[in-house]
Amino acid sequence: MVSEQIIDISGPLKGEIEVPGDKSMTHRAIMLASLAEGTSNIYKPLLGEDCRRTMDIFRLLGVDIKEDEDKLVVNSPGYKAFKTPHQVLYTGNSGTTTRLLAGLLSGLGIESVLSGDVSIGKRPMDRVLRPLKLMDANIEGIEDNYTPLIIKPSVIKGINYQMEVASAQVKSAILFASLFSNDTTVIKELDVSRNHTETMFRHFNIPIEAERLSITTTPDAIQHIKPADFHVPGDISSAAFFIVAALITPESDVTIHNVGINPTRSGIIDIVEKMGGNIQLFNQTTGAEPTASIRIQYTPMLQPITIEGELVTKAIDELPVIALLCTQAVGTSTIKDAEELKVKETNRIDTTADMLNLLGFELQPTNDGLIIHPSEFKTNATVDSLTDHRIGMMLAVASLLSSEPVKIKQFDAVNVSFPGFLPKLKLLENEG
């Protein structure tokens, strides 16, 4: 039976919160801590379903990972002592786990099979398999390169690779494979994509050179890896839902503490500022992964915007809730260059338009994005996350514009990235 959640929340929203740890960084911290021989502590990790799939796989490879209050303690024998798994490595709904481990396991040369849920089975893996095969990885998918992915031992060579899409997952799969090559690998990017893999390689003592659109690895880089402690900042993709909720709900005033504001991920902040939203950053820290507290206040008369190019790449996961924000602008907004949305958990161009249109908003899907007209919540029709966590949370935020409760099917999908999302939203309602 399909689960349903009735969302009955009204504003104003007021108070101070933190959001769960960054999903992208938690995945990478688990992977790197597992490769390094010794003990690493990962503080404030995200323990949603996706990151648990990554943890489960490394446990099968022989890594001891314990949950200790607000941290993970990773005791690893090191990559040289990894076991050959005797069962399929299940990645669930996690594209990050699937694609990054395709590169890492190919580099390790461990015979293994990666497979996920029905959603992962529909997501293309050819964009990862092509560069890995150029590196001489012995990896195959089924039916035109979909999961399961079958990996066999091979000797990885370095490559000079021009990225075909602006994708941090593809880039990271290549980088993880390159750790085990005795050659240099050079990656040329089309556009800036999130750089957590590069910054976290350095944190775990792995040498890497990165300029704006060019990344160069060092031969036999894996030999330099050392265990390290890592503090995971709050996930800006999760914070985005509260940012938009506060902006569109009258009299709201919300502060979110310890949010990661990596410049390759801060598109939501740039977009809100361009639209004239009342947003302030303070308590900023610097370093490999900068953080800040973010204060957001209700802002009427938001300005329309065209979101394209690098701004899309910097806000790719936030675009569904940004589309909702754009419905509250005083003119028509446009999202372009967002073809990548088609290969997420759902085709997010279509699902964003379909679900918001059901509620009375006016969005037109295009081949590479959305045209969004100023519009209001008109009906409390039942909507569906379609098992996409970000669509589910976006619809919950949309309900703030309704005077009636909204029913969302398959809302439990939000647990992929934000267990406790709804209680946190209700907490701000109660404080308001």
Swiss-Prot record:
Broad class of enzyme this protein falls into: transferase
Residues binding 3-phosphoshikimate: 23-24, 28, 167, 169, 317, 344
Reactions mediated catalytically: 3-phosphoshikimate + phosphoenolpyruvate = 5-O-(1-carboxyvinyl)-3-phosphoshikimate + phosphate
One protein family per Pfam: EPSP_synthase
Keyword set, alphabetical order: Amino-acid biosynthesis, Aromatic amino acid biosynthesis, Cytoplasm, Transferase
Enzyme Commission identifier(s): 2.5.1.19
Role played: Catalyzes the transfer of the enolpyruvyl moiety of phosphoenolpyruvate (PEP) to the 5-hydroxyl of shikimate-3-phosphate (S3P) to produce enolpyruvyl shikimate-3-phosphate and inorganic phosphate.
Record-given protein name: 3-phosphoshikimate 1-carboxyvinyltransferase
Classification lineage: Bacteria, Bacillati, Bacillota, Bacilli, Bacillales
